[in-house]
């Protein structure tokens, strides 16, 4: 059936045209509103992304404490099985008065920690080695280190023997977190404290160690014990850290211990009285762009410094300060690369209110300048 709508009048036509124009205007307005809303939404998303990026950058660059429920110090960090493992000493409240003989640093065991990423959850794997399990050791399990070779993990640690002389021991495990089984005797020819084992790209491993004052390094010369050992006079060359190639089984030295010489920019040995640059303790070695970086603590001036060289034995030339003084007496550190980023692990005593024997491990991103020098970090951050 056909319906005849009839002829539209001019008024009807005008009304339709007017309504059509209104629809066009409304449509344009909707498009404009949508466009503005879209721009506003995109701007909001952009600003949120910038804010999140800024927060992440702040988190990334701000030093972080590793754990809060246990006091740990002297962290040696390594990458094993695509995780970071940290091997620290374990501080305790020993009830011993703080004195110059450092008996109040009476650590008795080692806990090992791991994480999938910096800033992520940290796993405490519990006690990996206790002084009671080490036949030759008497007390004071100080700063350790670890290494992997031959399908085994090796934990290196200093401890005082039954006669109160510091020796360096080694314990072995099938897993990076332990537990570790100690050798029945310390490493032959070892002495002093703070072992750090570095494996070069050619597969050779070296141990760096030594520490003056309570670390007893001043009681040795050319690897031999001496009577009445003392610090050199201030205008004489300072005591040097020690280095030795490790045996293939990683359980002994493969050679006699050698001095590792640290020179000033003038090419002369750093003097014993140069407390801002001379070696005190806390050896660490890492490699960056083909250069060897030996870093250490200056002890009583509370700085972490570094020197560079062209081979594992040196000599090394002093370059600068990595970390300014922290809250607490001094710091001890390690440097490791993980997934393209370099990190500095160290400790301070801020959480314990400045008690030097109750320390907490921190981690911060480490950066290099174009010339290979290290950008200095503030210890109080």
Question: Where in this protein do the model-derived segments appear?
Answer:
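Carbohydrate-active catalytic/glycan-binding domains of CAZyme proteins
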Residues: 57-381
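Polar low-complexity intrinsically disordered regions enriched in Ser/Thr and small residues
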Residues: 9-17, 325, 375
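Bacterial Sec-dependent N-terminal signal peptides
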Residues: 1, 5-11, 18-59
